[in-house]
Amino acid sequence: MTKVLVMFMDFLFENSWKAVCPYNPKLDLKDIYIYDTTLRDGEQTPGVCFTKEQKLEIARKLDELGLKQIEAGFPIVSEREADIVKTIANEGLNADILALCRALKKDIDKAIECDVDGIITFIATSPLHLKYKFNNKSLDEILEMGVEAVEYAKEHGLFVAFSAEDATRTPIEDLIKVHKAAEEAGADRVHIADTTGCATPQSMEFICKTLKENLKKAHIGVHCHNDFGFAVINSIYGLIGGAKAVSTTVNGIGERAGNAALEELIMALTVLYDVDLGLNLEVLPELCRMVEEYSGIKMPKNKPIVGELVFAHESGIHVDAVIENPLTYEPFLPEKIGLKRNILLGKHSGCRAVAYKLKLMGIDYDREMLCEIVKKVKEIREEGKFITDEVFKEIVEEVLRKRNKN
């Protein structure tokens, strides 16, 4: 590393809210946007069923975040679902409200009744689905259904996204044929759905790049599942390949292994790739906790971005550095998304962490007292007891009592 680069990085670390690898590419991604499907695909997680009020609250919070589009549901599923979608559509949100529809007029009619701004109409295109899901229908037959659905929805003034289900297992020449036909029928956006999460970042980039070269004006959207933990990076590589829109769910909930996590995608683009999405980032933690509560799906404590332990530090070596400059062991400052860091005490704690806690408590100490408390903290944690603030207070009081007796 050159001396100039070292000086530049020192300047950045001292004057920035983030510190990332200087070799990260700066992506020229203009006019990209997110369409969130927590209320539809997220609710398809086995065991999840949001109430009407819960869906409304989540929609409001997504809108507060600043998302361009919210996929509110699948109206044809039930009258209750249709009522919820219609209520969200008439809530007066800034975001456009979309509904999911099969490539069937009755589905689209139901969506129209719900007053939505647009639809995502889908039909499978892979040989696997054509054989086993559609009883050996030909691609041309499927294509005809898709085109009719797009034309019908456009006749009714809707924004239309056409989604090729199982796109990543569809031959590229078939994808081009299907999506060109959808565009010619009036589709505003076409989707690459990685339905089983089987694509790699490189294949997502290739598919999106190839498709973009063959389309005239329709935006490309990517809808990635997380079966191999690739949903977020596949989404990013889709953008690199020319996609403009990304499908997400809060906390990555969804069928099987879930979808691209909204909060992870946003912060990866913002922090690592220096992309300004124009969003209210401080909304993210509250939104994630809300979906955690309403879905009943607990987030791991080490969940990227918003997990309980993401900005927590215990190791003495780490704590010493973090107190001097948090970016030594954090890629970005938690305050950027409305969170705070937490200095924890345990087996690996050193004098600096304990001194930090004592200072917060307003307690004076000398070196001997500090070392005694550190020793006690390690002993109690190794006995299996967590050093909560209350436990630490008890340790301090015990040490003070002993010192006063002497």
Swiss-Prot record:
GO MF annotations, alphabetized: homocitrate synthase activity
Any Pfam family the entry gives: HCS_D2
Reaction(s) catalysed by this chain's protein: acetyl-CoA + 2-oxoglutarate + H2O = (2R)-homocitrate + CoA + H(+); 2-oxoadipate + acetyl-CoA + H2O = (R)-dihomocitrate + CoA + H(+); 2-oxoheptanedioate + acetyl-CoA + H2O = (R)-trihomocitrate + CoA + H(+)
GO biological processes: coenzyme B biosynthetic process
Metabolic or biological pathway, per its Swiss-Prot or TrEMBL entry: Organic acid metabolism; 2-oxosuberate biosynthesis
Documented EC number(s): 2.3.3.14, 2.3.3.-
InterPro entries reported in the protein's UniProt record: AIPM/Hcit_synth_CS (IPR002034), Aldolase_TIM (IPR013785), LEU1_arch (IPR011830), LeuA/HCS_post-cat (IPR054691), PYR_CT (IPR000891)
SUPFAM superfamilies: Aldolase
Keywords: Transferase
UniProt KW Metal-binding keyword: no
Ranges of residues in domain Pyruvate carboxyltransferase: 32-285
Protein family (similarity comment): Belongs to the alpha-IPM synthase/homocitrate synthase family.
NCBIfam families: LEU1_arch (TIGR02090)
Further facts: Has been shown to catalyze the formation of trans-homoaconitate. However, probably physiologically functions as an (R)-homocitrate/(R)-dihomocitrate/(R)-trihomocitrate synthase.
Xref: PANTHER family: (R)-CITRAMALATE SYNTHASE CIMA, HOMOCITRATE SYNTHASE
Record function comment: Catalyzes the condensation of alpha-ketoglutarate and acetyl-CoA to form (R)-homocitrate. Can also catalyze the condensation of alpha-ketoadipate with acetyl-CoA to form (R)-homo(2)citrate, and the condensation of alpha-ketopimelate with acetyl-CoA to form (R)-homo(3)citrate. These reactions are part of the biosynthesis pathway of coenzyme B and biotin.
UniProt name for this protein: Homocitrate synthase AksA
